[in-house]
């Protein structure tokens, strides 16, 4: 089951402030989404990088945690951010379709259109991060 997340663009040194924020999207450019979790981001990273899921999960693991109960902060790997930022619309649709067919999204009842929307929003934000030389963080 996924949770509410905030995906934001920020400088690496902002990580501590992001984890302490009650709602990062009010302080940094980004978007809020329901139903996401570390496994979904790891699966996306695995699809983009060609890594095995377990390796991708390790790379997407929490960067910071306010406590054992959360919130947690992940930094989406730079190579996935770069890949997302460079993909054209038809390629983003293909990634969304592949991601929608994974166990992580199917079990939570995500439609292909919902997954494509998530991937597109993430790619748009990845473009901002790359243009500004910043990182893409996931607060959950």
Language model feature labels by segment:
Residues 137-140:
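Short hydrophobic/aromatic patches at helix-to-coil boundaries
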Residues 133-135:
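Short secondary-structure junction motifs
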């Amino acid at each position: 089951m996924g949770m509410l997340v905030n995906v934001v663009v920020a400088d690496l040194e902002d990580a501590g402030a992001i984890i302490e924020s009650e709602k990062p999207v009010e302080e940094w450019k980004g978007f809020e989404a329901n139903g996401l979790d570390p496994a979904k981001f790891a699966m996306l990273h695995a699809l983009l990088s060609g890594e095995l899921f377990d390796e991708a999960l390790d790379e997407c693991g929490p960067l910071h945690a306010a406590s054992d109960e959360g919130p947690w902060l992940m930094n989406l790997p730079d190579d996935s951010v770069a890949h997302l930022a460079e993909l054209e619309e038809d390629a983003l649709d293909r990634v969304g379709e592949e991601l929608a067919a994974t166990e992580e999204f199917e079990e939570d009842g995500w439609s292909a259109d919902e997954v494509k929307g998530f991937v597109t929003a993430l790619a748009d934000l990845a473009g901002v991060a790359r243009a500004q030389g910043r990182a893409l963080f996931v607060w959950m």
